[in-house]
Amino acid sequence: MIPYKQLSLADIFSDCHEKFENDKPAFLSLLETHIDIDELIPISFRNHFYASTGRTRKYPLQAFLWALIIHRIFSIPTDQLLLTFLAYSKSLREFCGFIKVPDASKITRFKQDFLDDLQLVFDNLVDVTEPICQAIDSAKADMTIFDSSGIEAFVTENNPKYANRIIKQLKAYAKAQGFDKSYDPYKAAYGSMPSHASANPEIKQLYINGHFCYVFKFGIVTNGLGIIRHISFYNKNFMASHPDIVVEKKSDSPDEDKCVHDSKLLIPTLKDFFSKHPLINPKTFLGDAAFDTAQLYKSLLTGDTFGNDKHFSKAYIPLNARSGLENLDYSINEDGIPCCPHDPSLQMKYEGTSKLRSGVTRYKFVCPRMKWIYDKSTQKSHRHCFCDNPCTSSKCGRMVYIYPEKDLRAYPGTIRGTEKWDDTYKIRTVVERDINHIKDNLCLAGRRTQNERTLHADLILAGITQLITVVLADKINHHEYIRSIKPLIA
């Protein structure tokens, strides 16, 4: 006889609950287990959102934040498609905390009304993730890398036909006038195009990745791991808070304009970064040739630029091809290494770095024809120059001592052209990959709006999403996912 077992209501509920938990997507369970969004929301944000004045909130703050983070983690291109996913996925809707799916206008108003609060969430996450970055790789976490780009706005001037029409007209004009090959229709087009979009003067013309576009310009500071540390949005508010920035009229060279503008934005951007995060104190700066100016080296490497005796120790910046280095006694190559007085193509050998009693650092370079000779009688080695046309009477050959503090541009705390320089400077590309990542994978590109606050919020949310990724990767002990957790979704 088969024994009869009566099912209780508790058993049925337990089975249903277990089935519900097992059917929940694994990635959402991972986020739910390891990320406490409440800990990351400043109390000021909560007070602002749930203010005593106005209507009662139908949708909770955490629900909006989770929805916008999921939006970017899953690379959902539009807000409307996100709402469609929420409508058809009960597990996603319940994970975010929505009882009912909000309208698209609610998402837009949330971004615009709470932009400053989203910035506070981002700044909080920067401080949370700094110890994680230090634990993963302290050398790379000690680096600061800066680059700028732009968010293309949804305006007429960004239609490819707009620029192509002007270029086509200029090519036809050049052909009719019989101009020679030195005439560049692309530079001429840049000069003839308006400096800002007709719909909004804050949408500026910029030359990015080989094409003209009209954008809201922004700057990003990352560390050597490629983790975002700071975001600056270069709008009227930024310019008003930094009146020392002088905006000049554009020239006929788009590349030159971008270099000049970036060099003026660097120090104000870094000052904002260090004022928000005084405990972060990196010692190495990496930047492209746009920052190769004597004044920038002085600001980066000396004084109280970023606080009381707070500055970088090294700056990895390649020399700009338009301006070289000069010395009356001997020539200096493009890497800042002294060359033989009789043969400028022969660079001297770097022999080491030493410090004087006064604490001043100096680099030592010796004749490239010099060799160490071992004397068996004294059991010691000594230098000997084997040059056929010596530039000095010394048997050791010519020696040159370089004092970096006298010429920070030539010797910014490190030696160009060395293996260490090459290996370190390669790391700079992480900021470019980061910009491409937040545009393509975190859905910053292709936004069909020209509203400044909406696009600014989208930029901040992209930064928040990346830092949430860092926290999650650390919680599950998979640091290889600090920049992207797409493998976990699959």
Predicted regions and their residues:
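An internal, acidic/charged active-site-proximal segment
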Residues: D255-E256, D262-D375
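Basic, amphipathic alpha-helical segments enriched in Lys/Arg and hydrophobic/aromatic residues
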Residues: D423-A490
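Polybasic low-complexity intrinsically disordered regions
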Residues: D113-F285, A289, A294-T302, F306-F312
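Basic, short loop/linker segments at the boundary and entry of helix-turn-helix/winged-helix-like folds
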Residues: A26-F74
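Short amphipathic alpha-helical "interface-anchor" segments enriched in bulky aromatics
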Residues: I35, L86-A87, G150, D329-V366, ...
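Charged, often Cys/His-bearing segments associated with DNA-binding zinc-finger transcription factors
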Residues: M1-F45, I476-A490
